[in-house]
Amino acid sequence: MTEKLGILAIGHGSKLPYNKEVVTQIANYIAQKHSDVVVRAGFMENSEPTLEEAIEGFSGTGVTKISAVPVFLASGVHITKDIPEILSLDKEGCGILEIDGKEVPLCYAKPLGADELIAELVFKRVQESL
């Protein structure tokens, strides 16, 4: 069986539309660069789709495994407690989703964290501000 990866990009959500736009655009960039991957964005609060709705968005896509990646810089309560509970993850950060009547394994990625790519982006923003 051929593997088909799904990516669930998880955003915090906000009453302001810009937060949703940023996370959705990041998901779109991933999808454009990796056309063989199914990418969906979902949000914790104040934005739609919710995580549950985003997971439903994998229906009919044929994904065989999903990576849930929080589009957050650092860990906090949402990362360590809320998202794992919503996704029914075990202590290793893995779980099973039912999509189209099939069990699909789910793995939970780390937040963005401290990374040279983030540092370069910060420096780019500094240069743009000058």
From Swiss-Prot:
Co(2+) binds at H12, H78. The keyword Repressor does not apply. Substrate binds at E48, L73, A74, S75, G76, V77, H78. It comes from the Archaea. Its EC number is 4.99.1.3, 4.99.1.11. GO terms for biological process: anaerobic cobalamin biosynthetic process; methanogenesis. One of its GO terms (molecular function) is cobalt ion binding. The keyword Metal-binding applies. Ni(2+) binds at H12, H78. The active site is at H12. It catalyses: Co-sirohydrochlorin + 2 H(+) = sirohydrochlorin + Co(2+); Ni-sirohydrochlorin + 2 H(+) = sirohydrochlorin + Ni(2+). Keywords: Cobalamin biosynthesis, Cobalt, Lyase, Metal-binding, Methanogenesis, Nickel. Pathway: Cofactor biosynthesis; adenosylcobalamin biosynthesis; cob(II)yrinate a,c-diamide from sirohydrochlorin (anaerobic route): step 1/10. InterPro entries: CbiX-like, SiroHydchlorin_Cochelatase, Sirohydro_Cobaltochel/CbiX. It is an enzyme of class 4 (lyase). Belongs to the CbiX family. CbiXS subfamily. Catalyzes the insertion of Co(2+) into sirohydrochlorin as part of the anaerobic pathway to cobalamin biosynthesis. Involved in the biosynthesis of the unique nickel-containing tetrapyrrole coenzyme F430, the prosthetic group of methyl-coenzyme M reductase (MCR), which plays a key role in methanogenesis and anaerobic methane oxidation. Catalyzes the insertion of Ni(2+) into sirohydrochlorin to yield Ni-sirohydrochlorin. Homotetramer; dimer of dimers. HAMAP family: CbiX. This is Sirohydrochlorin cobaltochelatase. It comes from Methanosarcina mazei (strain ATCC BAA-159 / DSM 3647 / Goe1 / Go1 / JCM 11833 / OCM 88). The gene is cbiX.
